[in-house]
Amino acid sequence: MNIDLNADVGEGCASDSELLTLVSSANIACGFHAGDAQTMLTSVREALKNGVAIGAHPSFPDRDNFGRTAMALPPETVYAQTLYQIGALGAIVQAQGSVMRHVKPHGMLYNQAAKDPHLAQAIAKAVHDYDPSLILVGLAGSELIRAGERHRLVTRQEVFADRGYQADGSLVPRMQPGALIHDEEQALAQTLDMVQAGRVKSVTGVWTTVTAQTVCIHGDGEYALAFARRLRAAFNARNIHVIA
C-alpha cells in the first residue's frame, strides 16, 4: 500500500531541510501568510534536491495571524488571490526546470473551504484555470474535494496526524479543547488507524469513516522531526510505501 506524506514548508521553521528528507510532498507558503520570494526559491530548490513533489500553499492575506483569521471574502477575490499565489510559485518552479504537482490551501482558507461550497468552488476553479493537471489537496470528505471533482481535477484526500477530529469528520477548531494532539503515541495510533483502517476516533469517542490519501505533518510542531521519523519507521514496518 502507498501513502503520501506532506509537510508545510517555507513558513520560517528551521527544521524544513531535515523534514524534506522524510516527506514525499511539500506545500510551500506563497507569501500571503508566511514566506517571500526568497524563501519560496530556497524551498523549491531544497524540495528538488530531495526528490519531493512541490505544491503551492495559498492562504488568506493574513501575515499577522499566520493565515488563521476567518475572512468573509467574495469568491471572486479568493479566486484571484489563489491564482496569484499559485502563479508566483509556479514561475519559480518553472525557472528551476521543474513542474508544480499540487495545491493545498492553508489555515483558515483550508478550513472554510472544507465547509463553504462557494469558497471551495473559487479555489478549485483557480487551480483548474491555472493548470488542470494539478492535484487539489483538501480535507478528506470536504466541500473542497467535491469542488475539485466537479472541475474534474485529480483530488487527494488529506488526514492530519496531530489534529483532533469531530464526529462529522471535520477538524476540531484550534481554539477548542482536543484540537491538537501532543502525545506522540496517540498521534501515531490515530495515523495508522486512518491509513490502514480508514477510520478516525472523534473527540466525542465516535468512530468516523475517513479516506486517507495523504498525511500532513506540521513542520512547526515541536516534535515534528522526531514524529516524522517514527511515522516513517511505522510505515516501513507495515509495508506502507511513502510516495507522492
UniProtKB/Swiss-Prot annotation:
Catalytic activity: 5-oxo-L-proline + ATP + 2 H2O = L-glutamate + ADP + phosphate + H(+)
Cystine pairings recorded for this chain: none
Keywords from the UniProt entry: ATP-binding, Hydrolase, Nucleotide-binding
SUPFAM superfamilies noted in UniProt: Glycoside hydrolase/deacetylase (SSF88713)
Any single biological process term in GO: carbohydrate metabolic process
Record note on quaternary structure: Forms a complex composed of PxpA, PxpB and PxpC.
HAMAP family according to UniProt: PxpA
Descriptive protein name: 5-oxoprolinase subunit A
Organism: Salmonella dublin (strain CT_02021853)
Lineage, uppermost ranks: Bacteria, Pseudomonadati, Pseudomonadota, Gammaproteobacteria, Enterobacterales
Gene: pxpA
